[in-house]
Regions:
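Glycine-rich, low-complexity segments
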Residues: 1-35, 39, 62-63
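Extracellular attachment/recognition segments
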Residues: 25, 34-112
Length: 112
């Protein structure tokens, strides 16, 4: 039936952990999958502020994933710097970020 098809088309998952990451103390990801697309919101805390971090997506996105970052604490400090995001590597499911203060949110959208 149509209802069963829709139930199998959309899924949601909450994932926690920092395996495969560096300079990350905590990470909680919220993943919504719709067919062959996924939206992943990651709430992340860094160990050392403004130092490069390697972040691993809990979702194996294909090439062409959209990534954006919001530094949730950056505007609170006079040392605020421009955030930098590296390219997503589909082979390792990782990307790099820098100039982040304390906690931040990442949004990834792409094909799976």
């Amino acid at each position: 039936t149509i209802l069963k098809i829709m139930e199998n088309l959309i899924s949601y998952e909450k994932i926690t952990g920092t395996t495969g990451m560096s300079n990350i103390s905590n990470c909680t990801s919220y993943v919504t999958k719709i067919g062959s697309f996924a939206i992943c919101s990651m709430n992340i805390s860094v160990i050392t502020d403004y130092t490069k971090a390697v972040i691993k997506s809990p979702v194996a996105f294909k090439e062409g994933v959209f990534i954006t970052i919001e530094d949730n604490n950056g505007d609170l400090y006079s040392t605020n710097r421009q955030q930098v995001i590296g390219w997503y590597n589909p082979a390792t499911q990782t990307f790099e970020a820098s100039n982040i203060n304390a906690g931040f949110t990442v949004l990834l959208i792409g094909r799976i």
